Amino acid sequence: QGLEKVYAGRGVLCEFELDPDARFQGEVGDLLEVLGNLLENAFKWARSRVLLSTRVEARAGSSGRRLCIAVEDDGPGIADAQIERVLQRGVRGDEQVQGHGIGLAIVQDIVRNYAGEMMVDRSPELGGARFTLRFPLSR
């Protein structure tokens, strides 16, 4: 809600598709840091829409499950050739856009600390960037 207020002048709307069974098994501060960074980036680049979704999914080749969190926007997206670069500490996707270039690197560090994975691609629904995080669930 805070980000919607900050970006209200641009008319960006945040939508939610949340699985009621999806629970993050970790420190609340880590989850807030991850979501804050991903949503801030999405709002920065979005034309009009941001989507946050969560779900629980089966882990491939295992009996375990994992939490999947995705943040998508309808902005210009990130070219495949630029994905690795924008995940580096201190690198920004566009020098004209405000930021320090450390947010995505922090997200990646936190995800790795939980033995999770982060994937960056194009949102099939919105057309912009999609950041998908997967965290193993212990139960």
For each predicted feature, which ranges?
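Conserved polar catalytic motif of the HATPase_c/GHKL fold
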Residues: 36-37, 41
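Short beta-strand/loop element within the Bergerat-fold HATPase_c
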Residues: 49-64
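Acidic ATP/Mg2+-coordinating residue in the GHKL
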Residues: 73
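Conserved catalytic submotifs in the C-terminal HATPase_c
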Residues: 13-23, 57
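Short alpha-helical Gxxx[C/S/T] motif in the catalytic ATP-binding
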Residues: 103, 107
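Short conserved segment of the HATPase_c
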Residues: 78-90
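Glycine-rich ATP-binding loops of the HATPase_c
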Residues: 115-122
